[in-house]
Amino acid sequence: MDPDAFLFKWDHRTALPQPNRLLDAVAPPPPPPPQAPSYSMRPRELGGLEELFQAYGIRYYTAAKIAELGFTVNTLLDMRDEELDEMMNSLCQIFRWDLLVGERYGIKAAVRAERRRIDEEEVRRRHLLLGDTTHALDALSQEGLSEEPVQQEKEAMGSGGGGVGGVWEMMGAGGRKAPQRRRKNYKGRSRMASMEEDDDDDDDETEGAEDDENIVSERQREHPFIVTEPGEVARGKKNGLDYLFHLYEQCRDFLIQVQTIAKERGEKCPTKVTNQVFRYAKKAGANYINKPKMRHYVHCYALHCLDEAASNALRRAFKERGENVGAWRQACYKPLVAIAARQGWDIDTIFNAHPRLSIWYVPTKLRQLCHAERSSAAVAATSSITGGGPADHLPF
């Protein structure tokens, strides 16, 4: 018997797979139904509303209904709170959609948060674009307020205001006691001075008084400016007086920007240059604008605004005599008191009536000088009626 007869030989060329009748009879299973898209899907259909509302508990279909009405993120950001209320009322009336109470507040909160984020990005972008040129341009004015020792007391009081008598000499004499008190408690005051920028008493009119009183309790710093004639460009490391007055114009521009942002956010709008404006200027890259410097020379700027001819004449006279900025600053008080005398001694009304001065607080020292001169004038008038001699200026 041939054993090969019982062997099965597989021919790969002719063999075909046997059809599976069982699988043919059974229909293929239907594909699984598509899952409902999550909240983070379909970003193009809602125009970015889902990203705006996602963190504020607003339902997806609420955002979809808002998108069906034609609203986008940019549209909502440019709408006021009253317009947002009208939009939500229209949503309820047109689609018969019941908005939850939390959704009404969530929509407004999301819009406000997005506005703040855009404003912060804009300030940061502006700081990156303008930071290099700004710091290079104004580094010289900033170095004047560094922690440097005083040259002499005459730098602070400016040679007694150029020989002016009466109250002006008393003010200069009262300032001679300041250096001893500064050296006594310098360490404690330096910490307080560093916290001054973060103080939030923006709307208190006593800021002007606090600034003048702090002259006694702060370490005296070197003046960052030199006396220059109108139109003269300063030479050396210090800037001229035209540049100083230009800083006040910049503060006015920053105040307008702060007011615009506050109105858009529905927040309290400042009417004067406060700490909020100085912080905004710092964020915008204008580190050379700070509260101590601007409050220190605000009466000089007031004279420049109220009587530019007298201010220019005073600058030329002090430039010819070689006087420093401290002497020029002290001499600026007397013309302002004379202006106040011609207008009933009401220096606050004079400031508030001027468009460029109404945003600044009246320095306490200027107000005190006006009060003292007013009292002296009243005493002199009384003495002339009774036949007495001339009255002396009253100290204060």
From Swiss-Prot:
Residues 221-225, 290-297, 361-364 bind DNA. The record marks 268, 275, 279, 326 as: Interaction with DNA. Residues 195-215 have a biased composition (Acidic residues). GO terms for biological process: cell differentiation; flower development; regulation of DNA-templated transcription. One of its GO terms (cellular component) is nucleus. GO terms for molecular function: DNA binding. Residues 144-223 are annotated as: Disordered. It is found in: Nucleus. Keywords: Activator, Developmental protein, Differentiation, DNA-binding, Flowering, Nucleus, Transcription, Transcription regulation. Residues 178-190 have a biased composition (Basic residues). This is Floricaula protein. It comes from Antirrhinum majus. The lineage of its organism: Eukaryota, Viridiplantae, Streptophyta, Embryophyta, Tracheophyta.
